[in-house]
C-alpha cells in the first residue's frame, strides 16, 4: 500500500491558522480492526416483548495509543453504551476498536494530537456503525452515537495525567 492511498487525510487549506495547519498534517491508516466486542442482553426475551419507550443510555468513550515501532502506532478507541430503565438493564455494548497509523513528516509537537485526535476522528464512523449494528442485532433500535469531540477527550486525558502526576508527587513527599 503506498503513502498516496485513499486512506490518507490530505492537507487542508490552512489560511495562516496554526491549529488548522496541525490538523491538516497527513495521517496514514494502515489497518483498522476490532480488538474486543461484547454485547449483553440480560433481560431478553422479556424486555423485547414489552420494550420501554425511553431508556436511559449512557455512552462512554476513551482513547489510548502505544508505539509499535519508530513509525507506527496502535490507536485504541473504546466505546461503551449502557441502556437501562429505572428498574431493568436493557443492554450493555462494549467495543474496543483499533487502528495502526503513522504520521510521516509530522513534527514531534504535532504527533501526539494527530495520534490522539485525528486518528480517532477517522476511526469513529466505523466504530459507531459496529455499535449500531450490534444493538440492532440484539433486538433493540439501532443506537446512533452522536459525533464525539475528540479534542475535549484529548484535553480531559491530559488533565487526568497531570492530576495523577501531581498526586503521585505529593504522595512521594509525604
Q: Residue spans of the language-model regions?
A:
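N-terminal intrinsically disordered, cationic/polar leader segments
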Residues: 2-122, 128-174
